[in-house]
């Protein structure tokens, strides 16, 4: 399962958000075998515009991720930092391709 999370973060909270995101991403990848990739980038000219590439082994792994204490902590801790969130479902064009 592959999807994109597109966020706009409150500029006054950007550094706090990045710290929370770093902790959540590192914990998820370390503890959850079904979380294959969480790769976050910000736009060069709009640093508050963040896109996260999320790759999960399958839908079961994604749903399990949503129930973990570290993800719930991230969501509750950052809810007032995020001005907008768009979750984009995707269809991989080369499904067998792996990120090295």
What are these regions (language model features)?
Residues 1-8, 37-66:
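Short, well-ordered beta-strand segments in beta-rich or mixed alpha/beta enzyme
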Residues 13-36, 73:
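Short amphipathic alpha-helical segments
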Residues 39-48, 75-100:
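Glycine-rich beta-strand-turn "strand-cap" elements at beta-sheet edges
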């Amino acid at each position: 399962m592959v999807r994109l999370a597109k966020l706009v973060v409150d500029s006054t909270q950007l550094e706090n958000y990045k710290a929370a995101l770093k902790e959540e991403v590192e914990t998820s990848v370390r503890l959850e075998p079904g979380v294959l990739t969480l790769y976050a980038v910000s736009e060069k000219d709009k640093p508050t515009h963040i896109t996260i590439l999320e790759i999960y082994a399958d839908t079961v792994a994604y749903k399990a991720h949503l129930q973990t204490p570290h993800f719930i902590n991230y969501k509750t801790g950052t809810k007032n930092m995020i001005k907008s969130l768009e979750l984009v479902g995707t269809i991989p064009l080369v499904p067998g391709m792996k990120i090295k």
